Amino acid sequence: MALQQIVEQTVAGLGYDLVEIERSAGGLLRITIDLPWQPPVEGAASDAAAPAGPEAFVTVEDCEKVTRQLQFALEVDGVDYKRLEVSSPGIDRPLRHEQDFQRFAGEVIDITLKAPIGDAAAGQVNANRKKFRGTLERAETGGWQIVWSDEPPPKPGQKVSKKRVPAPLQALGFTLDELRDARLAPIVDFKGRGPKGGPAPD
């Protein structure tokens, strides 16, 4: 059985989602897991009076449980590795599936296209550009887009004039097939993640 299939079946069987599999030099096999997420049901009545519960995260106990089961499964199938590491996603969590984009809509993400933007740039950005950072949104066409402003964020303590005209927002639509890589932007915010724009990297 292929490694991907072994890991997916084992992780899913324990009630977790497989985020990423990495094989590093020296025989390290790194597995990233997350708690399952269910999209909200459209049209379902919501209880406005009920407070939202705290967001759940993968714990050390979760990783230990998956590690034990994976060690057994990998040994049975004779998978060659030196060390197994199971962890939760970091602040730069990869986005690979449609459900990942649904889950993190409104967050700031970094994307890398497989090919330069080319003629679609329409003179607004460098036609050879592949990397973008912006807020993930659902496009009117039903696909996905990121929205950003090239205006640099104010420095700490800097006063921003109320008369200052903000830079226009730009949007880039894309399909998952056009992406080489997509991840949550590694933004450290002690108030918690929230939908907010960010400058696009060069």
Curated annotation (Swiss-Prot):
Keywords: Cytoplasm, Ribosome biogenesis. Required for maturation of 30S ribosomal subunits. One of its GO terms (cellular component) is cytosol. Its main location: cytoplasm. Gene3D superfamilies: RimP-like superfamily, N-terminal. CDD domains: YlxS_C. The keyword Cytoplasm applies. This is Ribosome maturation factor RimP. The gene is rimP.
